[in-house]
């Protein structure tokens, strides 16, 4: 992607985050926010606040007048401003990550936006095609972002992941629902503390900034679209992201693709977490 295009699409992504934030703000903490409207393309119920967020995100892309594809949990895949060929630019969007938090007015929810470029040969796009990632915490206004090869940032300040490598001093975020208790218990016994905050994209952003030392989701049910932005941000900050077997996560950019995930601020800590999981 040309530098001018990077600058342009970065501006679009930031504007999308700002406009979605404004659109959902009146619904946060209200009973109406949780009303189920339909079933989303990913097979899960779409709530009113999700639909409002996604409609606003689509509107931002429509307003550019440029051909672009959006991939989102509720709508699936939509080609915008396009006639004929599939657009070369892809926005992978979770318009509201942490929906339950937003409905209950728990201040930990936001948007995840990844910008990818389609393979010239027409191959299906994967996580490796993601060039930019943006995760905004609507409750605080903080924007975590990265451009491939250019580092990671919190607002305008460069960030780096944690250098903590001792398990007994590690703060770990996790999504553990549906995970076998033995696996969770084995980790809890060796780390300092565990946090469960309810937004994977934002918790991975915490790994990137060093607020968390590590994060894991072992369900094999984590949507690729949910981590498309934050995976890049963690890696650009110096962190390590793999599946629970230590393999690369390079899933297809679609709403059906799922994975497990183990992220750490550095390779040494990641290896220690993997060793703990392997003995179970």
UniProtKB/Swiss-Prot annotation:
Family: Belongs to the inositol monophosphatase superfamily. FBPase class 4 family.
Residues holding Mg(2+) 1: 73, 94, 96
One GO MF term attached to the UniProt entry: fructose 1,6-bisphosphate 1-phosphatase activity
Sorted UniProt keywords: Carbohydrate metabolism, Hydrolase, Magnesium, Metal-binding
Top-tier EC class: hydrolase
UniProt function note: Phosphatase with broad specificity; it can dephosphorylate fructose 1,6-bisphosphate, and both D and L isomers of inositol-1-phosphate (I-1-P).
Signal peptide annotation: none
Top-rank taxon: Archaea
Stated name of the protein: Fructose-1,6-bisphosphatase/inositol-1-monophosphatase
Taxonomic source organism: Methanothermobacter thermautotrophicus (strain ATCC 29096 / DSM 1053 / JCM 10044 / NBRC 100330 / Delta H)
